[in-house]
């Protein structure tokens, strides 16, 4: 990038996925994955804090088609996102998911380092728990 007036993008601040049953999604992300709810509008969205720097936005896909305060948006089919966890906690997460009857879809050990566990949320979105090393980036992920 050659424009000195524009700084480098530093982070993904929000990630959005879509689900029709927001009550079920709220229970899953709050009670199973331990995320804190930071915003809710019944029938439209539920938002979760992820770590110190990002937010997971879950929208009812029908409620965002026409726009409003935000531009219209949406997606068809399941989405995917990854949540970072410490390497030493991956076995505990595997057991926690099993104890909560969450089917593990796939496990991967990555060539650069890091490992991932994939599973689905109640809306069918692919959720990945990943340990540092996956991308070999300075931040560790």
What do these predicted ranges mean?
Residues 18-63:
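Core segments of cupin and vicinal oxygen chelate
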């Amino acid at each position: 990038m050659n424009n000195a007036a524009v700084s480098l993008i530093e982070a993904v601040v929000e990630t959005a996925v879509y689900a029709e049953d927001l009550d079920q999604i709220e229970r899953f992300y709050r009670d199973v994955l331990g995320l804190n709810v930071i915003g809710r509008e019944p029938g439209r969205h539920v938002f979760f804090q992820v770590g110190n720097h990002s937010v997971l936005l879950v929208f009812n896909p029908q409620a965002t088609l026409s726009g409003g305060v935000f531009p219209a948006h949406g997606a068809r089919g399941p989405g995917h996102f990854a949540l970072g966890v410490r390497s030493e906690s991956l076995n505990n997460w595997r057991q926690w998911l099993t104890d909560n009857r969450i089917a593990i879809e796939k496990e991967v050990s990555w060539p650069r380092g890091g490992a991932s566990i994939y599973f689905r949320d109640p809306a069918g979105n692919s959720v990945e728990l990943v340990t540092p090393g996956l991308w070999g980036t300075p931040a560790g992920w």
